[in-house]
């Protein structure tokens, strides 16, 4: 069975305490690999490496054009790793193999664009008009510099894409990074280290650590040697991170939960609107922070819309994420599946009308995995919990409205 190590100071390393964790395929419920599972000591070692690399100037003082060339070399190299990264991403996260391949390609394009922008379009220095005050002889300008050590804490729904977008922005501007993937979906970033070691990126500039957020993640957020934290995940954890960062006055970027509305008016093209609603709700089995799970439909077209939405949803092919024919895959973990199923029960008790799905699939081939049928509730009221709380799963709440003022 494959075993993956962390990446600190240019080397793959075991957890200092020797701890390992199992990676589980959500499509089968089976263990597919093990990986190093670190703690505070590993977090601090990664931060020390990033701090030393930044302060040395080996990356932060490098000419932007040279940094750009190195990052573009990495993007070129990643083309060779598309099949490998996409495979492990799909196996580990439950994302469809057809989508995870696209995620890697998206990262490659983003890396190239950002590298070029940082080198040739970004204004590192900007002259300003002289101020009309007593300092008439002064020269006014803005000089922009890399910030320092940036920590990226990554969600489990799009692990490689989310992690790399936190990293490549920071790297392009001359910062050093420590990234922590989610414990449920760590493998793609650990596989990525194979490519990383083939580049000219200096040691310590990029570090990848894996472990529980309660210990390793906390150690990263409270380490005084960091300069910035970027986090994507739940609102509850975001509150904790902001609180921890405040104690050392660190910059924070938070991308947290959502319960987005998808508003369908009476003059909408119904077929087009149904397509959009399905994508907005059921992409990656509903495990997307910007999912439009509150589908708010004008009462004049409400019944017709619900009928079309249910028919199209029932036609989705539920299956294993590694099958190219699958349109709707598994949930990331049993814990998340249980959360989704509990919300479906809440919706029933609240009086919402369950018109589609609402349970695990009956297909015996899917028995071992963490699957939930795409689910639709009709006649949902805004006061219901399923309409107010983020479920983070394939549960659509279709809510009628009468007029635009409402």
Q: Model-predicted segments: where are they?
A:
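Rossmann-like NAD(P) dinucleotide-binding subdomain of oxidoreductase/dehydrogenase enzymes
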Residues: 123-272, 401
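Glycine-rich loop-to-alpha-helix module at the N-terminal edge of alpha/beta enzyme cores
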Residues: 32-122
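Residues at or immediately preceding the N-termini of alpha-helices
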Residues: 26, 40-43, 64, 82, ...
């Amino acid at each position: 069975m494959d075993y993956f190590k962390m990446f600190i100071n240019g080397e793959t390393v075991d957890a200092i305490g020797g701890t390992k964790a199992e990676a589980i395929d959500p499509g089968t419920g089976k263990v597919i690999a093990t990986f190093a599972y670190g703690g505070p000591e590993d977090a601090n070692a990664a931060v020390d490496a990033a701090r030393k690399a930044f302060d040395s100037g080996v990356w932060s003082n490098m000419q932007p054009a040279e940094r750009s060339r190195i990052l573009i070399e990495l993007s070129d190299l990643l083309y060779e790793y598309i099949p490998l990264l996409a495979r492990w991403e799909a196996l580990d996260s439950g994302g469809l193999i057809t989508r995870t391949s696209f995620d890697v390609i998206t990262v490659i394009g983003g890396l190239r664009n950002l590298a070029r922008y940082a080198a040739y379009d970004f204004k590192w220095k900007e002259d300003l008009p002289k101020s009309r005050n007593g300092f008439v002889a002064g020269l006014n300008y803005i000089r922009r510099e890399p910030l320092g050590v940036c920590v990226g804490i990554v969600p489990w729904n799009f692990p490689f894409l989310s992690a790399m977008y936190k990293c490549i922005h920071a790297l392009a501007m001359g910062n050093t990074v420590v990234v922590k993937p989610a414990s449920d979906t760590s493998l793609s970033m650990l596989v990525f280290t194979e490519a990383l070691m083939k580049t000219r990126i200096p040691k310590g500039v990029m570090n990848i650590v894996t472990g529980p957020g309660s210990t390793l993640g906390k150690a990263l957020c409270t380490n005084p040697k960091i300069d910035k934290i970027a986090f994507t995940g739940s609102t509850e954890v975001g509150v904790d991170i902001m609180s921890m960062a405040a104690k050392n006055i660190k910059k924070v970027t938070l991308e947290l939960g959502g319960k987005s509305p998808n508003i369908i008016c009476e003059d909408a093209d119904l077929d087009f609107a149904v397509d959009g609603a399905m994508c907005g709700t059921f992409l990656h089995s509903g495990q997307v922070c910007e999912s439009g799970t509150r589908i708010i439909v004008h009462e004049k077209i409400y019944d017709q819309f619900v009928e079309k939405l249910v028919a199209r949803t029932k036609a989705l092919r539920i299956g294993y994420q590694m099958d190219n024919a699958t349109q709707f895959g598994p949930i990331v973990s049993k814990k998340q599946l249980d959360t989704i199923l509990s919300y479906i029960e809440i919706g029933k008790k609240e009086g919402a009308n369950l018109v589609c799905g609402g349970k695990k699939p009956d297909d015996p081939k899917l028995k071992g995995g963490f699957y939930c049928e795409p689910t639709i509730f009709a006649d949902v009221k805004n006061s219901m919990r399923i309409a107010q709380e983020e479920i983070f799963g394939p549960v659509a709440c279709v809510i009628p409205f009468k007029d635009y003022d409402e």
